[in-house]
């Protein structure tokens, strides 16, 4: 029994991720070896990449030269030099065709793998961004918005309480203002009544003054009349006395003459009696005049005293009314000043309340606007997150589709390789291995993003 072996191995290794400071990076290698042995054939397909290097090695079972071993093996299998040359020519053509086909497949796989790696890297970056976004912003945004909402609700509650308190104070001030207004109206009505009473008393005072002046005039007139009557009475008495004296003188003369010429009654005695009668009559008249004068004077004096008393009473009432009027005027002025001050305080309070309400409303509007802005930003963040998730799902679906395409390419490659192997000589065996991996370069650190290997092996053997 004799065995001859020829082994061909092709390997493609590519790394697209990884780098370092020492000039490392990805590496790609492509090696090819052929193996001929007695036995069956097999093929295995894996992944390929874009960058490659090709190397070939041939080994014989005993470690001699490759060509001699190949020639000896071929000649032994075909039974002569001509058959061996034909077999070698067919094998070379088959290997060249396989090499060209595998190179084309390698390029196609490399493009697919590059796209898959790009999509995987992009998907990984998006997943990392999504995780970072979720871990960083989502809880913080939620807590931030919840805290802001709690603060805003607390502020709104506080503003509502302040507004209610201010409304209560405003209502109290309005009630006090209404009370003071009612009091002012009552005092104004009382003032009007007092002013009317004062006007009436002024009229009565004027009437009393006029009556007093009239009485004084009457008293003066009566006094003048009394004086005039007294003077007239005195003049009449004086005239009567003069007449009486003249009469007495004449009677005395006549009586003397008569006594001289003829004796008769005593005229002196008669004259004395007449004088006594006239004196008595004058006394009675004087007494009557004095009585009338005194009576009239007493009546006028009493009337004057009554008028003076009425005048004093009126003056006292006027003084009292003036004092009451001054007190009421002062109280009215005080109430007016107090009412004016209260109206000013009420207006100032209403203005301050209106200003505070406007400030609170502006703050509420700002907070609501900020809340709407934050809600809009949150909605935008959620929309962006949703778009990222949709992109991730689309990339996952695209990756799955490329994976299915790769699996289909593997199946197709496996079928084509199997058909190519069936066309080769039964004494030859070929093994092709494609591997794609990513790793770190020489000096720098790197990270491996994945490994995908396609191995195609075909073996056929013959033992003697």
UniProtKB/Swiss-Prot annotation:
- Give the residue ranges for region: Head: 1-101
**Feature: compositional bias, Polar residues:** 1-14
Q: Quick one: where's region Coil 1B?
A: 145-237
Q: By its UniProt entry, which InterPro entries does this protein fall under?
A: IF_conserved, IF_rod_dom, Intermediate_filament, Keratin_I
Q: Where is this region: Disordered?
A: 1-59, 415-464
- Give me the ranges of the annotated region Coil 2: 265-413
> Where are the stretches annotated Tail?
414-464
Q: Which GO terms describe its molecular function?
A: structural constituent of cytoskeleton
Q: Could you state one GO biological process linked to this protein? A: intermediate filament organization
In this protein, which residues make up the domain named IF rod? 98-413
Q: List localization entries.
A: Cytoplasm
Q: Name one Pfam family in it.
A: Filament
Give the span(s) annotated as Coil 1A.
102-133
What GO CC annotations are associated with the protein? cytoplasm; intermediate filament
Region of interest (Linker 1), residue spans = 134-144
- Family of the protein in this entry: Belongs to the intermediate filament family.
According to the record's subunit comment, the protein's assembly and interactions are: Can form homopolymers.
Record-given protein name: Non-neuronal cytoplasmic intermediate filament protein
